[in-house]
């Protein structure tokens, strides 16, 4: 399949990108490789520079040497030496404490020098790759020395990483403090899930294809499942995870972003606020949870010992920096409803967790059965036909599962998949998931970034769960083995409604092997699926 593009995308605006926390993994693993990819695509301006700011004792020379040593570890394909030298010549470093006013003056001097050398036209792009507890402090210090001003055609934008607070109150306070220095249009709250092609394609899939949108409602859809599963444990993040847990870490940002893009009404345009208005409507339409709802429709879990790829792995309570009697959840499953005409009485089931059977993120749309089962006497292995799955990671694409007649002399039904695969149809991507987000920030397009009201609405939706779980500490942790799909209570959550979680991986394998399994039913000359 050939990709088509009506017009070439414009080159990103000239700017100095300032990375706070530049010595951390995010810079090496994601940001620099993403910038390299943008340069290779012709989307990064020649008038560009990077200034790293961190506490680590380095200077520009040693920072460049560190990146030079690390780049081969995190860039998926070899980097052209000339291209990499182009970057190194534009990378600078300022050492300092985020609380030290003198460090910000040194930073300002370095920014002005880089601007003069590389002609970045006074445009500034601050990336705060630090804990949210530093967001307000850093923005305040930048404001005090004039590094947040927009004047004479110059722009300044600030990207902040999740989490955006730790509850509704802290999110509201953070937004208030940021807006004392910045306008909403200057604040870009990043969610790297939205940098994935399939997530961006979800709106195109829904609103550019006339055969899809008419089916996208309560009349035809039985329920929706959203899964964000990780096969790894908390690794070196035990200290952070003890203060957060799976609910706060994943639901108000990643999972709610996927939910809103799935459920939103068509926007009047693809301008940033037009899209985000519709996403915010969904968050505000989430049915408020009572304490009884939380007990019935919210499941928490914590992983115990188990195996991952044949290797024994420890329980969460035995991870570094985790309390031996910790009640922090590493798994969450929720049943939510949206109170509007399109989705009334259609449940949305969300689940996320650590040390699960497979690393996968997907949205599964289960369509309703036909009103009259014409082929009800015909054996079929799995009655849950007509399921669409939007695969987000690790393999991006869309598949639609439906019933078809197995070739042969008798009426036998089998399940087949109609697949769109990004790697197969467009070629393998080397994207880190940050390219589009960095480019959009340079261009001032906030469509894929959360707005303040969306952040607060997300926290408000899970506030009842936070309160109930705080009042009623979990019992029986750990309650699922590493390498499983989570606690039994998550299965029960759907079983009570006569439904079940999608058998991720198994269904795809079934589709591949079903032809072989039915070989004896086919006559000569028939085709396999």
PLM feature spans:
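Secretory/organelle targeting and membrane-embedding segments
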Residues: 1-160, 164-529
């Amino acid at each position: 399949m050939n990709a088509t593009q009506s017009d070439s995308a414009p080159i990103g605006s000239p700017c100095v990108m300032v990375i706070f926390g530049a010595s951390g993994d995010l810079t090496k693993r994601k940001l620099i490789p993403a910038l390299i990819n943008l340069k290779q695509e012709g989307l990064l301006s020649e008038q560009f520079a990077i200034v790293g700011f961190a506490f680590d004792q380095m200077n520009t020379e040693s920072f460049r040497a560190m990146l030079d040593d690390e780049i081969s570890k995190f860039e998926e394909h070899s980097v052209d030496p000339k291209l990499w030298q182009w970057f190194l010549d534009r990378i600078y470093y300022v050492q300092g404490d985020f609380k030290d006013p003198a460090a910000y003056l040194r930073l300002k001097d370095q920014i002005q020098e880089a601007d003069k050398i590389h002609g970045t036209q006074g445009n500034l792009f601050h990336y705060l790759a630090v804990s949210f507890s530093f967001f307000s402090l850093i923005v305040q210090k930048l404001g005090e020395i004039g590094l947040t001003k927009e004047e004479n055609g110059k722009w300044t934008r600030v990207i902040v990483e999740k989490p955006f607070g730790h509850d509704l109150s802290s999110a509201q306070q953070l937004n208030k403090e940021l807006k004392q220095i910045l306008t909403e249009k200057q604040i870009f709250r990043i969610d790297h899930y939205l940098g994935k092609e399939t997530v961006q394609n979800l709106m195109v899939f829904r609103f550019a294809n006339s055969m899809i949108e008419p089916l996208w409602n309560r009349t035809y859809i039985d329920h929706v499942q959203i899964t964000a599963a990780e096969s790894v444990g908390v690794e070196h993040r035990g200290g952070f995870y003890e203060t957060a847990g799976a609910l706060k870490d994943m639901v108000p940002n990643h999972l709610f972003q996927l939910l809103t893009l799935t459920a939103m009404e068509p926007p009047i345009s693809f301008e940033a606020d037009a899209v985000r208005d519709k996403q915010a409507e969904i968050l505000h339409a989430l049915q408020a949870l009572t304490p009884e709802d939380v007990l019935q429709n919210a499941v928490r879990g914590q992983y115990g010992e188990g195996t991952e790829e044949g290797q024994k792995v420890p329980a969460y309570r035995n991870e570094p920096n985790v309390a031996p009697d910790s009640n922090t959840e590493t798994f969450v499953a929720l049943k939510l409803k949206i109170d509007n005409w399109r989705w009334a009485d259609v449940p949305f089931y969300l689940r996320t967790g650590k040390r699960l059977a497979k690393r996968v993120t997907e949205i599964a749309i289960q369509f309703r059965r036909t009103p009259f089962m014409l082929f009800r006497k015909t054996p079929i292995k799995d009655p849950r036909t007509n399921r669409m799955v939007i695969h987000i990671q690790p393999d991006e694409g869309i598949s639609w599962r439906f019933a078809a007649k197995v070739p042969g002399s008798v009426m036998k039904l089998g399940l087949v998949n109609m697949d769109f695969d990004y790697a197969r149809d467009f070629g393998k991507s080397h994207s880190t998931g940050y390219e589009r987000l960095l480019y959009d920030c340079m261009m001032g397009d906030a469509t894929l970034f959360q707005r303040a009201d969306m952040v607060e609405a997300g926290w408000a939706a899970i506030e009842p769960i936070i309160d109930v779980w705080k009042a009623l500490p979990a019992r029986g942790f750990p309650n699922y083995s590493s390498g499983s799909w989570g606690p039994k209570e998550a299965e029960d959550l759907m079983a009570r409604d006569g439904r079940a979680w999608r058998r991720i991986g198994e269904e795809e394998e079934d589709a591949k092997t079903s032809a072989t399994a039915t070989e004896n039913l086919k006559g000569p000359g028939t085709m396999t699926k």
